Amino acid sequence: MANTKEIQDRIKSINDTLKITNAMYMISSSKLKKSKKMLSDTEPYFFTLQSEMSRILRHIPDISSIYFKTNEDKDAADKKVGYIVITADKGLAGSYNHNVLKLAQEQLEKNPNHSLFVLGELGRHYFEQRGIEIEKQFHYTVQNPTLNRARNISEEIIELYRKGELDEVYIIYTSMINAIQEETQIEQLLPLKKADFNIQIPVDFKREELALKPSPEVVMDRIVPDYIVGFVYGALVESFSCEQNARMMAMEAASKSAKDMLHDLDIQYNRARQASITQEITEVIAGAKSQKKKRKK
């Protein structure tokens, strides 16, 4: 059995760890609330953009736009596919990073002709260690997502797409289903699919006059980049929220384990202390008996 000093040292060490896990839990909780508010504050604007795009497509379903081209004339093997992969800058977030990287790895194996745009230090280290080429100039943090960062990311990707250097772009991120469930998703970012914009006209729908100047194509090409920014921003915030939520759950589990260990160590300490006291009493009694025998002699 360990002595009381060793047990006290272990108790102190676990208490120090418990303070850290509790602090990390509180920090992640605060960041989660902040990120949810950021998303809710900007959602109305981007939902309006989506609604306007649906409205234009409802009136002009055959509109010509580079953002809606299908690339059906190209073989799948010839298409250059871009993947935006959103991971975390830090660990201690349960299976959050593992799930994203696993899905990304599966997609890369399906499409050898790809470009990889990785957000988050852990993701960059993961692919670099495995010798998988990533875009070196694409270097963004995922901490505290901002619209400006989403705009910069979107502009880089859109420019490559418009130049024809990318035929398709997908984004891999994590969405929050509820407080205890997250889901890793892959969504096609470019080209857009008209079917995703609910352009079917209801039977009793009265077609209104729609004036788009200088032309429907120009208006659409102006709206789409902002819509892409909104999509990327939403994915960044969702992923950041999931990271914080996963870290909260990991820290909660770690704190529970630490408390269980402290409970067991308290019992061990009390037993060791009791054994030590018993040993001391036994030694005192034995010593007293020995002295008594000496006096009789």
Language model region names:
Residues M1-K297:
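C-terminal beta-strand-loop-alpha-helix "lid" module of Rossmann-like NAD(P)-dependent dehydrogenases
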